[in-house]
């Protein structure tokens, strides 16, 4: 039998071990000293199991930026016409700065437009803002501290609201 097959047979216990061990390592039985183990003291202190006080979750859900009751006066709206998904960063940066953003996705293919709407929806959800569909492939993203009046939304829908920055 070849060496590899013999070793496999020895490993599986089908053949006797040939005893190919070096004699220089010898028997280690005499080299070890036994140590007595000391018993470990167990803690017998009784802890009272009290439930933790319940906190109101609505206090933790407040937005991190600014007071919620203050509504900023609308001074400008940024209109973007992205052509690829790579322009999502521009949408996010303008929205993060507190500027309402109009996304006109009519120049994008449907797959990238869907990705950008998903990005915008996540952005708006994370910051507690709002997203509104103005017309087909045109969306208004409003930060949480900004209120866009109904007549402004109507002007946006009619196409009369351009970038005022």
Curated annotation (Swiss-Prot):
A Pfam cross-reference name: SepF
Region feature (Disordered): 23-75
Keywords from the named record: Cell cycle, Cell division, Cytoplasm, Septation
UniProt-annotated location(s): Cytoplasm
Recorded coiled-coil stretches: none
Disulfide bond residue pairs: none
The keyword Cell division is annotated on this UniProt entry: yes
One GO CC annotation: cytoplasm
One Gene Ontology biological process: division septum assembly
Gene3D superfamilies: SepF-like protein
Entry similarity comment: Belongs to the SepF family.
Physiological role: Cell division protein that is part of the divisome complex and is recruited early to the Z-ring. Probably stimulates Z-ring formation, perhaps through the cross-linking of FtsZ protofilaments. Its function overlaps with FtsA.
Subunit structure: Homodimer. Interacts with FtsZ.
Protein name: Cell division protein SepF
Organism the protein comes from: Nocardioides sp. (strain ATCC BAA-499 / JS614)
Lineage, top ranks: Bacteria, Bacillati, Actinomycetota, Actinomycetes, Propionibacteriales
